[in-house]
C-alpha cells in the first residue's frame, strides 16, 4: 500500500512540475509591419479584428506595427487604394478575382494572406514567417500570396 501511495505522490508531483509550465516566449529584436485591409460588415474581418489583432499585439507587443485600412471609408479611399495597389503590384501571380476582398493581411517583406480561417493558425504563420520556417497549410478560406522580394517563398 505504501508503495502505491509513493508512486501516486511521485506521479502528482511530476505532472504538476512539468505539465503546467509556461510556453517559452519568443523574443523579437526587430519591428515588423502588418498591413490589415478590412471591410465593415465582413464577418471574417470582424472576427479577425476582435480575436486576431489582440493575439498579435500580445505576442509581438511593440515589435509589430499594425496599419489598419478600412476599405469602405470614403474619406481615406485614395490612400487605402494606393496602399492596396502597391501591395498587389508586389505580389507574384495575384488573382484579380480576389481584388477588394478582406481581410487581407500583409506582413511587409514576408508574405500576404487573404482570409483567415483560424486566428491562432494565422499567428503561428506570422511567427513562422519571421523565423524563416514553413507556413501552416492554408485553411479553407485562406489564400497565401508571395511577394516578389518577400522572405517567404512558395513551397
Language-model segments: residues:
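Typically the conserved alpha-helix immediately C-terminal to a functionally engaged Cys/Sec
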Residues: 45-59
Amino acid at each position: 500500500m505504501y508503495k502505491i501511495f509513493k508512486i501516486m505522490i511521485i506521479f502528482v508531483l511530476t505532472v504538476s512540475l512539468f505539465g503546467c509550465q509556461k510556453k517559452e516566449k519568443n523574443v523579437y529584436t526587430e519591428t515588423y509591419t502588418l498591413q490589415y485591409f478590412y471591410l465593415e460588415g465582413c464577418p471574417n474581418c470582424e472576427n479577425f479584428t476582435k480575436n486576431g489583432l489582440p493575439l498579435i499585439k500580445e505576442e509581438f507587443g511593440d515589435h509589430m506595427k499594425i496599419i489598419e485600412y478600412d476599405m469602405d471609408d470614403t474619406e481615406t479611399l485614395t490612400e487605402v487604394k494606393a496602399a492596396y495597389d502597391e501591395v498587389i503590384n508586389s505580389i507574384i501571380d495575384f488573382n484579380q478575382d480576389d481584388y477588394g476582398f478582406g481581410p487581407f493581411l500583409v506582413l511587409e517583406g514576408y508574405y500576404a494572406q487573404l482570409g483567415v480561417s483560424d486566428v491562432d493558425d494565422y499567428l503561428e504563420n506570422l511567427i513562422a514567417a519571421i523565423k524563416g520556417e514553413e507556413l501552416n497549410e492554408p485553411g479553407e478560406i485562406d489564400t497565401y500570396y508571395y511577394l516578389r522580394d518577400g522572405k517567404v517563398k512558395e513551397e
